[in-house]
Amino acid sequence: MEHHQPEHPAPGETRTAEAVSPENHKVLSEPKEHPQDKDAKEADGAAGEQEPVDQASLPAQGQDNFESPPPDASSSQPGPARETRPETETAGACSRLQELPQSPRARQPELDFYCVKWIPWKGEQTPIITQSANGPCPLIAIANILFLQWKVKLPPQKEVITSDELMAHLGDCLLSIKPQEKSEGLQLNFQQNVDDAMTVLPKLATGLDVNVRFTGVSDFEYTPECSVFDLLGIPLYHGWLVDPQSPEAVSAVGKLSYNQLVEKIITCKHSSDTNLVTEGLIAEQFLETTAAQLTYHGLCELTAAAKEGELSVFFRNNHFSTMTKHKGHLYLLVTDQGFLQEEQVVWESLHNVDGDSCFCDSDFHLSHSPGKGPGTGGGSGSPEKQRQVDQDYLIALSLQQQQPPPQGTSGLSDLELAQQLQQEEYQQHQAAQAAPARAPSPQGRGAASGRPAAERRQRPKQESDCVLL
C-alpha cells in the first residue's frame, strides 16, 4: 500500500513533508521491496481490500484518530499527497459501507410516523394519536392518556408525529415525577423504578410482555414493564377472568398466570395420573372457549372496578387500548387510522365480548356509520334528535337490567343477564338489517349495532303489520 508514494512525488512533495510525521515517515520508508513501476491495478485492488477496514472503524473512531491508525490502516495516510482522487474514492466507499448495515434502520424511521387526530375534549381541542394495523399500541395508548389529561401538548394543527417524539414526551413525564415520600429508602426505591421505566421505554414502540392472571381485572405478573404504568398512575386492566360459577375451571386455573397455565396444560397432558389429565383438559378448554380474552364475568368485574371518568389502559388479545368509563358504561378510544377524518367517531362502546359495539363522538353521543347518506337517517341530525337517540339508548340499557330473568338464567347476575339480553337484541337487529345491501366499511360492525334499542324494538312490530296486510 505504501508504494503509492513514489507515483506522484511532485504534486504532493511539500504537502507530504508537512503531513507525514516522523512516526509515519518510519512506516513510509519501510517498503523498499516494491518495484517503482508496480502494477497500478494490483495497488488499487490492495487499496480496495484495505479501505473497508479503515471505513469500518470510521464511525467508531472518527477522522481525528486517522493519523495514528494501526499499521494496516497506514496505507490511507498518503491520501492527501495523491491529490484528491483517493479521497473521493475513500469517501464513496465509506458512504456505501455505512449505508449497507444502516439501510434497514434508515428506512425504519421514515415509516415510523403516526397521524394526529384533533378532537374536542372537554371544551378544548386535544390531539390523539392514530395507528395503523402494526402500530405500537402500548406507546400510543399511554400517550393518548397523557394527551387527554393535558399532561402533554402538541403544537396546534400538528398532523404527524414520530414514535421518537412520543417516547421523548413520555420520558419527560417520567423524569418530571417526584416521589411523594421523602424518606431515603422510598426515594431510592422510587429512583430504581424510574430507572427501570426508562430502560423499558424503547419496548413501548415494539410491544410489552404482559402476563395476565385470571384472578382479577388488575392482576398481572409484575414485570419491569408494569413500572411505567405505576409511575404514571395509569391503571392497567384486563377482562380475562374465570367464571366463579364453573368450579371445575376455577380449580383447574387457580391463581396461575397465563404462562403458568400453559405450562400446566403441557405437563398434565403427559401425566399418567388421570385426574391431572382431566384437569389439564379443563384448563385447555377454558383457554379455547375464552380465546377472545374477555369473559362476561370479566366484563362485569371490569365495569365495577373502573372509576367514573377514569382514563386507563385495557389489555386484550395482545392489544392495548385507551379506556374510560362514562355514566357507568365502558368506552375504548378509536385509534384506527381509517377513522382519521371521521370527527364523530371517537369512542367505541365495550358492552359485550363478541365485538358488537357502537361508536360515539367525543361527548359520548351515538354516531352513525360514516358511509351513510343523509337520507338514511345518518349524518349529523339536529341536536334534539341526537339527544332523543341517546336518551332512548340509555333507557333501553336500564330496562334490560330491570327485566326479570327468563327461565334457565337464574344463575346469572343482573349485569350478566343484561349483557346477554342486549346481545340477543343486537342479533335480532342484525337479522332485520340483513336485507338491504350496505357498502362495506371498517365501521360497519359498529354501525349495525349503533341504533338505539327503542328503534330496534319497533321493527318486529312493523314487520308483523306487513304480514297482516
Swiss-Prot record:
Region Ubiquitin-binding domain (UBD), residue ranges: 388-428
Region Disordered: start-end pairs: 1-105, 401-469
Catalytic activity: Thiol-dependent hydrolysis of ester, thioester, amide, peptide and isopeptide bonds formed by the C-terminal Gly of ubiquitin (a 76-residue protein attached to proteins as an intracellular targeting signal)
GO molecular function term, any single one: cysteine-type deubiquitinase activity
Biased composition (Low complexity): 415-448
Signal peptide coordinates: none
UniProt keywords, alphabetically: Hydrolase, Phosphoprotein, Protease, Thiol protease, Ubl conjugation pathway
Sites of Phosphoserine modification: 103, 441
Matches recorded under Pfam families: MINDY_DUB
Enzyme Commission (EC) number: 3.4.19.12
Active-site residues, as the UniProt record annotates them: 137 (nucleophile), 319 (proton acceptor)
Feature type site, description Ubiquitin-binding: 414, 417-418, 421
GO BP, sorted A to Z: proteolysis
Its job: Hydrolase that can specifically remove 'Lys-48'-linked conjugated ubiquitin from proteins. Has exodeubiquitinase activity and has a preference for long polyubiquitin chains. May play a regulatory role at the level of protein turnover.
Stated name of the protein: Ubiquitin carboxyl-terminal hydrolase MINDY-1
Organism: Bos taurus
Gene it is expressed from: MINDY1
